[in-house]
């Protein structure tokens, strides 16, 4: 009865039935596709593209396109996709996850939806976990796509920008998940649209989707650079600030805590540092350091805002009076205070750009994936990525023997039993794969086998270079392979002809905290209907057993007088282990979900900044945008200085000083003129004067150069402020969980404070751009420059050394090359004229 109900209500079964009908349609088309010549078969691609332009959809083309790919695969690769592979292809095309067991031909399955979706010309990304697999699949499956007239590209870390652009321009691009994410970040740090490599993200198929979207979900991709805050500059700025006098060299507004140099102060700085114009773009860093030095000396007070403890500056929480250890002021203020107090100035590395795989892959119009094990994480895929997991039936029934776990009292007893089992199977010639959780376990078993005289291969992080060769040999007679955490996914273990009747034996030395990893190990045996056996050996001293109350069981084994050589084989124990694994999986899912909620705050901000950066990059004239920024800056300044209810308390002098110092020239705006106006009327005459000055500035140089100058300023300011903001958000995130002690929801606080910080950053960007546009002297040979040269850092989740990938740098411009400013002239006759 239960079986019947299960069939009626089984959603997966319903999906399979629905797809079976489409498979029958594809089969029916075979008789008309098979007689076609190679040229006629290739011609189908053009026909499909034309039909798409006339209004048909890819869904309409699916049966015929799949039939064409099946026939082409038979001719080019000598492989004909089975019906279950067609089902897998349909599930992928619909934006779902195809769970297909090991050896069922996932790579061939992917060619069906890849071809269909590549017909749109928008690009399809096939994502793999490492470059070896990307190259293998691109060369093998690429033959099929190229036969059908589509272009195939491969995107590798070592490639130049031009090679990457070519790879992404292809109809189908094979790449690793890391490289896709880093290219996205680098594109959004670029200064010229010609430097960008990616097209809009259309459709991705992720191989081993659980590994990328679940196991690596919490690992952010980071491009970081040494923060260009030389400690030396802090020392110089600090020494200079000590010589300044209040009122004469700087003005301090107690209410707004705003401190800035006066004209005298600016002149003093220019003399002290032997420069002509403090507001020149070349001196951005110097001005920033002086301003932060001023804030450190005038605004920040020892034992009120911070304390000096054990040679470190520790912030004091203004609300609770508690010390906030580990928190640092952003934008270099912390280093300025360190210089003021004479303690060691810490040089921070700065995150220039960051994104998690969760957020990167959610940007695709359509996303799908394939793996042998995804059903256990179905809830996560559905809730976070909006993908259903469809379990595709195997082509032949699975006849593998999955035996119940054997539980030993101690680790020693367990390993002795494992080695004995391996030796016995090795004598019979049966190939054995031993799965371990840690590298040290694999090396311990290796030593024990060496003592017994059993030849074997070890596959772990230390020798992954030979991964493919070791896996290829693992199915031959008498082979013994020890693999850590199922390294070598993506390559099948093919059985030698002389062991086809016994199959592969898989031995697990302990249960992983995730059932999925155990299932991956099991799935190595019994591929494509082959025989095979799987057996897990556990001990009461294993981490999972220790964490989830095995004391009772240990006591029971003692009472029964069981020694190390006697295991217990019990369904009850297996169930207890499985429920422990479910609990751990639940905890991990909650952690990933929480990470996503926090990361979403930065995601929304990142999308706003990157979208505006893109607009700036593609825009020919930023004048309108900059005028809008000036208007906002003036309105904010007016509001700040006239916020008191009583007119006499308005700080009109402060407003005039601010405008003359930052935006206008002395005498452009007079105090008595503004006093006659209401606050809402003050902005208009100021903005008119600003535009007048802007027009004068434009007349001083050619139009092209003015436009490039605007872009230089906007990029420099936006990128500097954005990287500082990411840094500040990092620091906010580190300490936010402590708010929970005050009965406050940390996530809500993070969202609110993050939004306030973002608004403050936008205001700061607008103000600084306005100031540089109005005050900076313009040089003839302006060039856009990256704020910081970054390098890609992908923190390794398994504690190995972090992988570092350099940002691809642009080529040097030759004197006879076209100028990068977009003028159409040769470099020597344009921006290179002065050099």
From Swiss-Prot:
Chain intervals for the UniProt region annotation (Disordered): 788-807
GO biological process, one term: protein import
PROSITE patterns with a match to the protein in the record: SECA, SECA_MOTOR_DEAD
GO annotation, cellular component aspect: cell envelope Sec protein transport complex; cytoplasm; plasma membrane
Cellular compartments annotated: Cell membrane; Cytoplasm
CDD domains: DEXDc_SecA, SF2_C_secA
Subunit structure: Monomer and homodimer. Part of the essential Sec protein translocation apparatus which comprises SecA, SecYEG and auxiliary proteins SecDF. Other proteins may also be involved.
Protein name in UniProt: Protein translocase subunit SecA
Organism: Bacillus cereus (strain ATCC 14579 / DSM 31 / CCUG 7414 / JCM 2152 / NBRC 15305 / NCIMB 9373 / NCTC 2599 / NRRL B-3711)
Lineage of source species: Bacteria, Bacillati, Bacillota, Bacilli, Bacillales
